[in-house]
């Protein structure tokens, strides 16, 4: 194919291929066990596939309504009200999205104007900042530090200016596996009270919280719910990340702006999958039982590495485990992850990739959303270092 005949000014000149793609590709090339990218290596229940097939075979294969199938929006509304006590209107306050990343991107581009500032907490999921920059906004980065990765509320207060348009939060947090508390949400509410600041709450791991803790959702905090986009993911909840289906909750004024953008970047989402998910959600145990399911995997993984030379950080939620490796190597985290993949046969993610300045605290991220046989094989290799 001939090359493009003129210079091209990139909208994202500093952005390359994501670290997740890089490490997964390297894992495949090396035949390594992939504990890098955050997806399961096991299937969802057959009944979910059967419901998709049912809706396909009975003729539900055309466009769904722009906001999503009403049956699914109603099921989401019922779940949210049961869990968090807030009634969202399925007609005007819930939208089904093509995954959580699309929901985050759409929320940012719908509300951020050139010159606006958006506060993010590093280490930060890699889609946030590009969305802000494409909207013409300026990311304001506040750093969370190992080992506890707690927000510094004095720093948050100092970072808020008249130009602050939005604050993006993520709880349970990827990559650190920390969770925010109700007290954290109260502090956030106090800092944004009387302002026009919008909160985008990335809560895709809402059902994966351990040790008897409860997820502190912005949807359950009336003051924050009134100014927040709350984003969740069916992929994370039902082990179907490749289906790319999520949803967003917001008060009708915010949702009206969201849908203006949503209708032009995806319009709508796969119809039979939406209807199948509406059916599948009827059994609440499928999401309320997720914490125990993943806590067992977390416990297995941590126990299997207890005598290794890795120092495991606390994991309070998500399906990720951070580990220090200073007792093993003096390499930087990216080089160490490459070494692990090529020489040890286990792929992980360097946490420096989640910091704009590449801050390297010699911490890497493993994903334990895997079959026990996969985790056992990976831990055998990691224990041999």
What label would you give each PLM region?
Residues 78, 339-348, 354-385:
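PLP-dependent enzyme catalytic core of the Aspartate aminotransferase-like
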Residues 278, 294-302, 312-325, 359:
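Conserved glycine-rich beta-strand-loop-beta hairpin in the small C-terminal domain of fold type I
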Residues 134-140:
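A short helix-loop-beta submotif of the ANL/AMP-binding
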Residues 220, 226-295, 299-305, 385:
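Conserved core segment of the aminotransferase class I/II
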Residues 140, 144-211:
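Active-site phosphate-binding strand-loop segment of PLP-dependent enzymes
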Residues 110-132:
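Conserved PLP-anchoring active-site segment centered on the Schiff-base-forming lysine
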Residues 2-4, 9-99, 106, 280-282:
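N-terminal small-domain helix-loop-helix segment of the aminotransferase-like
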């Amino acid at each position: 194919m001939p090359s493009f005949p003129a210079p091209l000014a990139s909208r994202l000149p500093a952005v390359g291929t994501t670290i997740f793609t890089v490490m997964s590709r390297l894992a495949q090339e090396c035949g390594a066990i992939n504990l890098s990218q955050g997806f399961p290596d096991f299937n969802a229940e057959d009944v979910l596939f059967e419901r998709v097939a049912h809706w396909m075979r009975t003729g539900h294969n055309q466009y769904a309504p722009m906001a999503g199938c009403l049956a699914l929006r109603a099921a989401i509304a019922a779940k949210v009200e049961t869990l968090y006590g807030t009634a969202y209107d399925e007609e005007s306050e819930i939208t089904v999205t093509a995954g959580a990343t699309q929901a985050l991107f759409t929320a940012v581009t719908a509300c951020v104007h050139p010159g606006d500032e958006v506060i993010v907490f590093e280490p930060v999921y890699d889609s946030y900042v590009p969305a802000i920059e494409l909207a013409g906004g300026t990311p304001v980065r506040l750093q969370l530090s190992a080992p506890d990765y707690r927000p510094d509320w004095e720093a948050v207060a100092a970072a808020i200016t008249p130009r602050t348009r939005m604050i993006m939060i993520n709880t349970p947090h990827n990559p650190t596996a920390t969770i925010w508390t109700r007290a954290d949400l109260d502090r956030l509410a106090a800092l944004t009270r009387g302002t026009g600041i919008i909160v985008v709450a990335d809560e895709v791991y809402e059902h994966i919280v351990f040790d008897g803790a409860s997820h502190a959702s912005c949807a359950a905090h009336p003051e924050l719910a009134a100014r927040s986009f709350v984003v969740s993911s069916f992929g994370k909840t039902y082990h179907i990340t490749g289906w790319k289906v999520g949803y967003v909750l917001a008060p009708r004024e915010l949702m009206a702006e969201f849908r203006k953008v949503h209708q032009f970047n995806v319009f709508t989402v796969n119809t039979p999958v939406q209807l199948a998910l509406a059916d599948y959600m009827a059994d609440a145990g499928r999401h309320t039982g997720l914490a125990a399911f993943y806590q067992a995997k977390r416990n297995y993984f941590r126990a299997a590495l207890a005598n290794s030379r890795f120092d495991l950080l606390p994991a309070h939620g998500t399906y990720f485990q951070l580990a220090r490796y200073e007792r093993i190597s003096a390499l930087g985290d990216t080089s160490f992850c490459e070494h692990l993949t090529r020489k040890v046969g286990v792929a992980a993610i360097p946490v420096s990739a989640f910091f704009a300045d590449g801050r390297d605290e010699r911490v890497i991220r493993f994903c334990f959303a895997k079959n026990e046989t996969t985790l056992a094989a990976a831990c055998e290799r990691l224990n041999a270092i």
